[in-house]
């Protein structure tokens, strides 16, 4: 469209209408946030200009002093926030103001809870803070021009927050963005110098850009702006200040700025590293998970600066995938200003910064787990599943990550993941040499698995793993504190010193006496099983299925197939309980057809008990009904 195009009216994306209503009605009691959001956006625009100007200084247009200006007009009842940052082109206005990113809309609205505090957190998280202007304004006018375009390529966007907005091309000599809020009736407090400065100092003191207002003076009992500017905020990089000079409130507000979050963080770590590498890191652990936590392709949360100059958002090379929830800033004194993402991938300096930062985050989590366990429980509920990716990604810190993991177990027998491996080892029975676990596709399936029967009888604790990522975890974490991790559903069971001689003798006798039955069942089941043997892991169930020590677990096989991935079919071993009535009934069965039905029923119910699916459910039902019909009436 040409620079001289006339005004046009465009409709908001449907989701934007919903969002505007949410902003106006749900967040009113927390309305000061609109100013923080607009200032934060202006600060981001300045950061982007600084970065683009590294390769094209002409973008500064002889105006390199970046600032945010705030002004109010009592007569017109307007509040104006302007910046001389990067600005926007016409298409960028349509993309960023008229729509919300398509990928995020469904998740956004599915997560709205009606809880004002939680919904406010989502708004920041989805990067839609601009719309908070409508909390206090019934009309918003945005005028902008992108750096590098000529004055006639200015764009004016205006909306009353209903179903549509207007867009027109205007002259704008200065680059950057100006937002004029036409205040609603009853919002006169935002026409007060004191109120605006109070909000800025509360929420935006840490913004590195100067936030400028006209000084005011009192004349005849009326507060009147003068021609003299004053900077309202501290306008210095918070992370570069000494820790002792920064209050908890300042740390919290800075987090909300860098993370676009409305909730305070769970913990933070502020460090200045000197020596071979010189850098400052200010890293935060959020108090809640972002909506896209499990999308490994989505943005990371670390902003990279070089000597206070913003370089890039979402610098994925600075934090491994399993710590993708960490937010914050890293400011290097050594990297070149023209550093690119490609350079980051092969930079030893970046590797050193990453390694140091990971250690700080893990140390912060260790401190939380040890000194504030109730907070760590909250952390684990939000981020536990991604932490379980760690041992497979970060070999150097595997033991440290393992110490941070939490699980459900038979010790508590609830689905709360509160048991650490250190806790488990501390409770191991005398003579126990392994850490036992079971994986299943639900907590109930793990908790009630027949594989646990002998362990429950002997009081041996078993970890109950039911997260999808647990299969990945156990495939990469093989031991802790010198103790191997062993699945109770894999391989032969050898409890060693945990069984007495009488038990071992009884097992051998049962194996010997059941040999003919074992051979009959094996012949009858044929290709359905790898082997059949007598078990000593069952006390109440007639049978269970186990896989080989080096084989893929049945649960992992199901997960892969459900995800549409190729997975080898692993034949299980059927283990039978020699003391169970069904097994003794089978042993005495002389009719070959009935024996076949009993043997298949035994296998199929063992398959169901471990969460498996039957290839032919109708045959299972037919067999079961036939055998039930034979019972005495």
UniProtKB/Swiss-Prot annotation:
Pfam families linked to this entry: HATPase_c_3, HSP90
PROSITE patterns membership: HSP90 (PS00298)
Alphabetically ordered keywords of this record: ATP-binding, Chaperone, Cytoplasm, Nucleotide-binding, Stress response
Positions of region (B): 342-558
Matches recorded under Gene3D superfamilies: 3.30.230.80, 3.40.50.11260, Heat shock protein 90, C-terminal domain (1.20.120.790), Histidine kinase-like ATPase, C-terminal domain (3.30.565.10)
Family as reported in the entry's similarity comment: Belongs to the heat shock protein 90 family.
Originating gene: htpG
Cell location: Cytoplasm
Name of this protein: Chaperone protein HtpG
Region C, residue ranges: 559-633
Chief subcellular location: cytoplasm
Cellular component, GO annotation: cytoplasm
UniProt function note: Molecular chaperone. Has ATPase activity.
Subunit structure as annotated in this protein's UniProt entry: Homodimer.
Tagged with keyword Chaperone: yes
Region annotated A, chain positions: 1-341
NCBIfam families linked: PRK05218.1
MF terms in GO: ATP binding; ATP hydrolysis activity; ATP-dependent protein folding chaperone; unfolded protein binding
